[in-house]
Structure formats: structure tokens, C-alpha cells
Amino acid sequence: MATQSVSNGAVSNGKKYLSLFLSKEEYGIEILKVREIIGMVDVTPLPRTPQFVKGVINLRGKIIPVVDLRIKFQLASTANTDLTCIIVVQVNHPDKSHTLMALVVDAVEEVVNLTEADIEPTPDFGGAVQADYILGMAKIKGQVKALLDIDAVLHGVEWKK
């Protein structure tokens, strides 16, 4: 898969989200968090890290940690396919610093523009993903998708077992 650059433009009447698949479930992440989408590459494993931390990749001389969201969210394991890819995202920390991290996902689908009317609060009942990891639930083309708060998902990741 060729490297794809993602435009970082917000729309005045809404926000853009990248639609992605994890174990046949569809999620969205804010496009402004996405720095790059690349095909699956070899990941160098790191010792003594949680199972969801796959290791690191070297992206043009920068070492970036790789997290498998399927494992982090305790979703069904799926084999990598030609559509499996890595999304490089910028994670913002409470101290205003930021880190680049890479996410293994089953596939990316499209970028959609959502207005506030398209997004509803996260319900209080249990689900595959912790409620504090979700910005809201979006209605897209007749389907409901969870919009992930990547900062919450990846901030404070326990790197050691």
C-alpha cells in the first residue's frame, strides 16, 4: 500500500473524521489527529510491554511506538490482510506536549464531515470500548459509529508489564 498524506483542513460547519475498521467494527478518529496512513510494515517488538504494544517502527528516521487497538479494546483477533494498515496519529498530552504513535487497524474507509447534529453523547451502557475513550456516537449513512478520543485512548498507556 502506498503512503497517503492526509489533509489537515477542518470545515467551518463541522469536523472531519477518518472511518476505520477494527475486527469488523467501524470507528472514527478526528482527521486533525492523523499525520499519515501507511501500509503494514515490519514492527520491531519491545520486551516487557503490554500485549497491545506491538513494538516500534522506523518512519523516515523517527522511531514511533505501535499500538494494536484490536488488542487494547479486547476485540476479536483478526489476521492481517492487504487492507491492514498503520495510522500515524499525534497524541496530545495534558502538559501540552505531543507524541506521534502508530495504530494498527484492519482497514480505513473514508473521510466524512460531521456536524454537531450528527454526533450524539456516548450511552452509559457497557461496550467493547471504555466510554471515556469515546467522543460520541455518529450517525453515518444509516449506521452508528463510535468516534474515538485518541488522546484518551493513548494517554497514559502503561508501557511496562
Predicted regions and their residues:
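An acidic, low-aromatic, low-complexity terminal/linker signal
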Residues: M1-K161
